[in-house]
């Protein structure tokens, strides 16, 4: 993000952090109760969704 501003922790409740066994992996946006939209570079078979 270029020129972005910090936000409060509850300001964007649809933001998702994806972690793998080594820590933070990628981020995404919660579309509904089942789906998270991420960038294509977040695709990996090295993690399991819970």
Curated annotation (Swiss-Prot):
Pfam family, one: Trypsin
Compartment(s) where it occurs, according to its Swiss-Prot or TrEMBL record: Secreted
Annotated Peptidase S1 domain residues: 1-50
Disulphide linkage map: 26-42
Glycosylation sites: 20
Regulation: Inhibited by serine protease inhibitors PMSF, benzamidine, leupeptin and aprotinin, as well as by copper (Cu2+) and manganese (Mn2+) ions. Not inhibited by metalloprotease inhibitors EDTA, EGTA and 1,10-phenanthroline, as well as by barium (Ba2+) and calcium ion (Ca2+).
GO BP terms: proteolysis
Thermal dependence of catalysis: Optimum temperature is 4-60 degrees Celsius.
Main location: secreted
Cellular component, GO annotation: extracellular region
Cited InterPro entries: Peptidase_S1_PA (IPR009003), Peptidase_S1_PA_chymotrypsin (IPR043504), Trypsin_dom (IPR001254), TRYPSIN_HIS (IPR018114)
Active site residues of this protein: 41
Enzyme Commission numbers on file: 3.4.21.-
Tissue-by-tissue expression: Expressed by the venom gland.
Post-translational modification (record): N-glycosylated.
GO terms for MF: serine-type endopeptidase activity; toxin activity
pH dependence: Optimum pH is 6.0-10.5.
Enzyme class label: hydrolase
Keywords: Blood coagulation cascade activating toxin, Complement system impairing toxin, Disulfide bond, Fibrinolytic toxin, Glycoprotein, Hemostasis impairing toxin, Hydrolase, Platelet aggregation activating toxin, Protease, Secreted, Serine protease, Toxin
Family statement: Belongs to the peptidase S1 family. Snake venom subfamily.
Function: Snake venom serine protease that interferes with the hemostatic system of the prey. It preferentially degrades the Bbeta chain (FGB) of fibrinogen, with minor effects on the Aalpha chain (FGA). It presents a lower ability to degrade fibrin clots than BpirSP41. It shows a decrease in the clotting time of human plasma in the presence of increasing doses of the enzyme.
Additional observations: Acidic enzyme (pI is 4.7). Negative results: does not degrade the gamma chain of fibrinogen (FGG).
Subunit structure: Monomer.
Protein name: Thrombin-like enzyme BpirSP27
């Amino acid at each position: 993000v270029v020129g972005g501003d910090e936000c409060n922790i509850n300001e964007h409740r649809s933001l998702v952090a994806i972690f793998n066994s080594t820590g933070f992996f990628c981020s995404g946006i919660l579309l509904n109760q089942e789906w998270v939209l991420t960038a294509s570079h977040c695709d990996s078979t090295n993690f399991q969704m819970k």
